A protein has these predicted regions:
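Short Pro/Gly-enriched beta-strand edge/turn motifs at strand-loop
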Residues: 58-60, 115-118, 142-149
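Hydrophobic-ligand binding "helix-grip"
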Residues: 39-41, 47-50, 124-171, 180
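Bacterial N-terminal signal peptides
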Residues: 18-31
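A conserved amphipathic terminal alpha-helix motif
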Residues: 174-176, 180-223
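N-terminal secretory signal peptides that target proteins for export/translocation
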Residues: 1-14
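Second-shell loop/turn segments in exported
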Residues: 72-77, 83-85, 150-151, 189-196
Length: 223
């Protein structure tokens, strides 16, 4: 699968749904991400069977936290690449534009040790969403946690989240994603909320497709 084909697949998302989900994924509140979100204890025996079949497992969640009406949850996907390869892709913050739908920029700045800022931009027609993420790499856990820099412009009320990759059977990787977001109120929000929830939790699937496309591209280059 070429990069162009992969981007065409991602561009087929509902425009309205992605306008919000794009901002939702990366616009994060100042509070630190909950460690409980990153746990694999939520996976049941049936979930593990579904994962083994190559399916995406999603667990939606709602939570009221102060004035914030949060929704999101967790999702998991097995990827047919070694964990070391998945981690290289995950910690390459400037490469996020390659697997976040409609992303056109992911520029890294102020990188000091494990911390970095990432200026994200998503575009679709006249829609142009920008924000700066404060990210932390946790190599010992194979995780990236992120939150919005609220001193910069942002298009969502609140949220936070993480990516994580771990070794799985037969030299594969279990990728997990979790986020809780408050996208605000209004008639438009109430209409798109179900689609946003679903697409937000599909992020591990799109990460998987990106890595598979990278592998195919590398093999073609060698041949």
């Amino acid at each position: 699968m070429t990069h162009a084909t992969h981007r065409q697949e991602r561009d087929q998302w509902s425009i309205l749904a992605w306008v919000v989900v794009a901002a939702s994924l990366f616009a994060l509140m100042v509070a630190a991400p909950s460690r409980s979100l990153a746990s694999s204890d939520e996976l049941t025996t049936e979930d593990k069977k579904l994962l083994a079949k190559g399916e995406l497992v999603m667990k939606p969640k709602n939570e009221q936290r102060g004035a914030y009406k949060l929704f999101g949850g967790q999702s998991w996907q097995i990827i047919d690449v070694p964990a070391s390869e998945a981690w290289q892709a995950l910690k390459n913050l400037s490469g996020y534009k390659n697997f976040i739908p409609l992303a056109t920029e992911s520029d890294v700045s102020n990188q000091v040790g494990k911390e970095a800022d990432v200026a994200m931009r998503q575009q679709w027609g006249p829609i142009d969403v920008k924000y700066v993420l404060q990210t932390t790499l946790e190599a010992e856990r194979g995780a990236v946690v992120f939150r919005v820099d609220h001193s910069k412009d942002h298009d969502i009320r609140a949220g936070w989240g993480f990516f994580r990759v771990r070794p799985y059977k037969n030299d594969r990787t279990l990728v997990s994603f979790g986020a809780l977001v408050d996208i605000g109120d209004g008639v438009f929000v109430s209409i798109v909320r179900p689609a946003v929830r679903k697409d937000l939790l599909r992020i591990p699937y799109f990460f998987k497709k990106h890595l598979e496309a990278e592998r195919v591209g590398a093999q073609v280059a060698v041949d």
